[in-house]
Swiss-Prot record:
PANTHER family: QUEUINE TRNA-RIBOSYLTRANSFERASE (PTHR46499:SF1). Zn(2+) binds at C315, C317, C320, H346. Keywords: Glycosyltransferase, Metal-binding, Queuosine biosynthesis, Transferase, tRNA processing, Zinc. Binds 1 zinc ion per subunit. This is Queuine tRNA-ribosyltransferase. Its cofactor is Zn(2+). Catalyzes the base-exchange of a guanine (G) residue with the queuine precursor 7-aminomethyl-7-deazaguanine (PreQ1) at position 34 (anticodon wobble position) in tRNAs with GU(N) anticodons (tRNA-Asp, -Asn, -His and -Tyr). Catalysis occurs through a double-displacement mechanism. The nucleophile active site attacks the C1' of nucleotide 34 to detach the guanine base from the RNA, forming a covalent enzyme-RNA intermediate. The proton acceptor active site deprotonates the incoming PreQ1, allowing a nucleophilic attack on the C1' of the ribose to form the product. GO terms for molecular function: metal ion binding; tRNA-guanosine(34) queuine transglycosylase activity.
Length: 381
């Protein structure tokens, strides 16, 4: 099958599977949004505060990025959803014309375990910025996201920690379902914003199944698997994803939250996942690390001081086309800010290109052979 676009549907949001792997559950698809088409499987860069750290929107477009993320919790704290709305919405505010997804802020709130209190109505917590008391409920999370104006918004959920006992996870699953119902009732921009539900359940298979069954009944435009990559070993993440993904509708996009390593993405794509996000490419860049063909290189290492090759001769990114490993090593040693921009551009391009290669392999039914080493290699310790 070729990679050409299908006819744009009448509905503002729809998902089509173009091809499937004959040996795994991997699939190549297209997710239509009001701000463009997302070709899946796809890695999505994270721009927590309405920017991809050190990278301009123009530079970001050059990486092949299609959909990006911003964070409701952080944008509520600074600058505030009212300012974003007054600017014309998130797209205009940050100068990004493609699709945007906003997380509900639930994960960030629940990570503030010492600063919060949970009740059925919502969560009260103290801002880590200034100690101010803040209240966030399903209704408020949706109202904030409605004002921000992203294409895809996430339901407010309760993310149980890892490890957690069964009763704690059960309570989180049941509350997540009740909160989703409230999110649906509060959501008043259904024509131009797709609300995704988030499957919880921790490491308990039956609770994952319970969560998926309950949330699928809401018939939402898409679903995410949450509560993973929160401290579990890699093999447990793979087990959860492999078990949970088939429980989600085939005709809806499936999003695995907070995952973005090579191996984890390949394994998840084989299970049927379409979308990924992670801060890895920019975070590694800020620490002087480059992602190169499945490896992680520390450019501060002395072996790069007189290495005048590009990071990756096969990479088409701006960094690899114009600069050497030695130059990047020099910038890092001199603590020049340009180093972080150039490495971020490359790392984002690398992960997007990686998922694009997987997509092409699926379209031509070569996924299981071309990515066999990633599918069969043992989990890292």
């Amino acid at each position: 099958m070729n990679d050409s676009l299908q006819a744009i549907p009448n509905q503002p949001f729809s998902f089509f599977t173009q091809a499937s792997c004959s040996h795994t559950q991997a699939r190549a698809g297209q997710f239509f949004t009001p701000h463009g088409v997302v070709e899946t499987p796809r890695f999505m860069p994270v721009g927590t505060l309405a920017n991809i750290k050190t990278v301009t929107p123009e530079q970001l477009r050059g990486t092949g990025a299609q959909m990006i993320l911003a964070n409701t919790y952080h944008l509520h704290l600074q600058p505030g959803e009212g300012i974003v709305a007054a600017a014309g919405g998130l797209h205009r505010f940050m100068g990004w014309t493609g699709p945007i997804l906003t997380d509900s802020g639930g994960f960030q709130v629940f990570s503030l375990s010492e600063l919060r209190s949970i009740a059925e109505a919502g969560v009260t917590f103290r801002s880590p910025r200034d100690g101010e008391e803040i209240y966030l409920s399903p209704e408020k999370a949706i109202a904030i996201q409605n004002q921000l104006g992203a294409d895809v918004i996430m339901a407010f959920d309760e993310c149980a920690p890892y490890p957690a006992d069964r009763s704690t996870v059960t309570e989180a699953v049941e509350r997540t379902t009740r909160w989703l119902e409230r999110c649906c009732k509060a959501h008043d921009r259904v024509e131009d914003q797709a609300l995704f539900g988030i499957i919880q359940g921790g490491t308990y298979g039956d609770l994952r199944q319970q969560s998926a069954r309950s949330l699928v009944e809401f018939d939402l435009p898409g679903y995410a698997i949450g509560g993973v990559s929160v401290g579990e070993p890699p093999e447990l993440i793979e087990k959860i994803v492999k078990f949970t993904t088939p429980l989600l509708p085939e005709h809806k996009p499936r999003y695995l939250m907070g995952v973005g390593t090579y191996r984890e993405m390949v394994q998840a794509i084989a299970a049927g996942i379409d979308l990924f996000d992670c801060v890895i490419p920019t975070r590694l860049a800020r620490h002087g690390n480059a992602l190169v063909r499945g490896e992680r290189w520390n450019l501060k290492n002395s072996r790069f001081r007189e290495d005048f090759q590009p990071l990756d001769q096969s990479c088409a990114c701006y960094t690899c086309q114009n600069f050497s490993r030695a130059y990047l090593s020099h910038l890092l040693r001199a603590r020049e800010l340009l180093a972080y921009t150039l490495l971020s551009i490359h790392n984002i391009t690398e992960l997007i290109s990686f998922t694009q290669k997987i997509r092409q392999a699926i379209l031509h039914d070569r996924f299981s052979s071309e990515f066999a080493s990633w599918l069969t290699s043992p989990s890292p310790s």
